[in-house]
């Protein structure tokens, strides 16, 4: 009788090219790479003498990373799949997805099955497993609003752990996994709580304008209407990484205190801003970058997109160092002109 396959077996790919595994399309290489299709492979890493002592990097869609050099370690390509309704109650569905699932496809799947809530996050690049790390957000919604829990493997021990929202310590484009947990865990699956009573989030004018342009009253919009509107907006504003390498929004929208904002507003009355519940004010980073004259400009093969100043692009052949140099030049000009610090969203390695 043939032996069943070993789900923990790890097939190593030496000197593996990474251009196809990051949305910037930056040409870098990993000492080793391995495709992970089952949680047991994460759990067995610490027992594999070939790679146990190497640095590890988990990659999903590669939409939140900029390689400035080759990676002298093991890149784990998270391809763990699966989507299912774990349970439901009177108020909500609890939906689990594998860490390697494509995020946009997962959002579409929830709507196809009558479970709304995530539609404002349509077309964000990357995987389900990357979504909590970054606490992705768009058009008035952040992922943690519908987050229930996740399962992650501690790579050094192979131990699986469940994290609730409090333990994930979500912040604006931030979480425990970007700080203290960075590089220590691989996210195997994420569970979302999607309410059975849908509450549309239409606070962004771009979304309501797109709905109205489609002949849809915002008051009558369905979850699918919002999904389609968000997809149309993002496609109009953001380049397709398959055609022009990019990582989506490169900088976080900075949040400043009210006193700083009042002083800034006096100097720049047209500044685009969004009041926050805690009294602080979020600024539109794209507006700041545009006002510094960077939209459409380039440094070498790295450039600022000509339609969306928040997006840096690879015009062809850009290195990670090129992208980083462009980002630093933009940060310098925004700091000089507005006294505001811009923080990159992607991790630069």
Curated annotation (Swiss-Prot):
Lineage, top ranks: Bacteria, Pseudomonadati, Pseudomonadota, Betaproteobacteria, Burkholderiales
The yes or no answer to whether the keyword Iron-sulfur is present is no
Q: Which Pfam families does the entry link to?
A: FAD_binding_4, MurB_C
Segments forming domain FAD-binding PCMH-type: 25-197
Listed GO biological process terms: cell division; cell wall organization; peptidoglycan biosynthetic process; regulation of cell shape
**Domain of life of the native organism:** Bacteria
User: What is the reaction catalyzed?
Assistant: UDP-N-acetyl-alpha-D-muramate + NADP(+) = UDP-N-acetyl-3-O-(1-carboxyvinyl)-alpha-D-glucosamine + NADPH + H(+)
Q: Return the InterPro entries for the record.
A: FAD-bd_PCMH (IPR016166), FAD-bd_PCMH-like_sf (IPR036318), FAD-bd_PCMH_sub1 (IPR016167), FAD-bd_PCMH_sub2 (IPR016169), MurB (IPR003170), MurB_C (IPR011601), MurB_C_sf (IPR036635), Oxid_FAD_bind_N (IPR006094)
What is the role of the protein in this entry?
Cell wall formation.
Species this chain originates from: Burkholderia multivorans (strain ATCC 17616 / 249)
Q: What are its cofactors?
A: FAD
Keyword terms, alphabetized: Cell cycle, Cell division, Cell shape, Cell wall biogenesis/degradation, Cytoplasm, FAD, Flavoprotein, NADP, Oxidoreductase, Peptidoglycan synthesis
Task: Indicate whether ATP-binding appears among the record's keywords.
Answer: no
What protein does this entry describe?
A: UDP-N-acetylenolpyruvoylglucosamine reductase
State the EC number(s). 1.3.1.98
Q: Which pairs are disulfide-linked?
A: none
The pathway where this protein functions is: Cell wall biogenesis; peptidoglycan biosynthesis
Subcellular location(s) of the protein: Cytoplasm
Sorted alphabetically, the Gene Ontology cellular component annotations on this record are:
cytosol
